[in-house]
Amino acid sequence: WQTDFSYFKIIGWGWFYLSTILDDYSRYIIAWKLCTTMKADDVTDTLNLALKASGCDSAKVIHKPRLLSDNGSSYISGDLADWLDDHGMDHVRGAPYHPQTQGKIERWHQTLKNRVLLENYFLPGDLENQIGDFVDHYNNHRYHESIGNPADAYLGRHTAIIESHSHH
């Protein structure tokens, strides 16, 4: 799983930070949370949402997802390290000044911002609604050359789709 924060400014409200968990293989957005800070608690809140959404919080899995992040202060905090230990998750941090390591999530945030910044949002709830709508569009309708859409790849439907196309 890749994770990162992205910034949004709402006039009259200040800065908001979007914490996202993206599945590295499929590019599927598993979970996201709009936060007023970028602390370890914001990361663990988003991770809890992702574990629940993916079923990893209740299923018996041999390997929990591994977290890939940059070296931002919330990701190098001892609190996050303890939380990951408690949940049996490994953490890999990209090399400093090498954003390509998290290329997929950087690209996701860029795509989201290009779309959402064109819209008018005046309240945090408006921004949250815009993000939610775009996550749904991105996961279920946006086509990627190599995998179809992220939901198909994440849920394992893409192989059946590829096979059905090859028989035509």
Regions found by a protein language model. Name each.
Residues 23-24, 34-41:
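A short acidic/small-residue loop/turn micro-motif
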